[in-house]
Amino acid sequence: MKSKLFISLSAVLIGLAFFGSMYNGEMKEASRNVTLAPTHEFLV
């Protein structure tokens, strides 16, 4: 019983770490695109 709980918990942690790294990568891409965008687009 304990081993099954431990395995499921570790699987959830691995999934969270994987999706967290993917999310961070997407956020970095988005912020990079925003900084590269011309400023007049935001001023209009």
Curated annotation (Swiss-Prot):
One of its GO terms (cellular component) is cytoplasm. Induction: Transcription occurs independently of the rapE promoter and is controlled by the Spo0A-AbrB pair of transcriptional regulators. It comes from the Bacteria. Contains a predicted signal peptide cleavage site in the N-terminal region, however the propeptide is probably only subject to processing events at the ends of the mature peptide. Keywords: Cytoplasm, Secreted, Sporulation. One of its GO terms (biological process) is sporulation resulting in formation of a cellular spore. It is found in: Secreted; Cytoplasm. Residues 1-30, 36-44 form a propeptide. Disruption phenotype: Inactivation of the gene leads to a reduction in sporulation efficiency. The keyword Transferase does not apply. Changing N24P: Restores a sporulation-proficient phenotype in a phrA deletion mutant. Signaling molecule involved in the regulation of sporulation. Secreted during production, but the mature peptide acts intracellularly, indicating that it needs to be imported into the cell to function. Inhibitor of the RapE phosphatase activity. Does not inhibit the phosphatase activity of RapA and RapB. Probably plays a dispensable role in the overall context of sporulation initiation. Belongs to the Phr family. This is Phosphatase RapE inhibitor. It comes from Bacillus subtilis (strain 168).
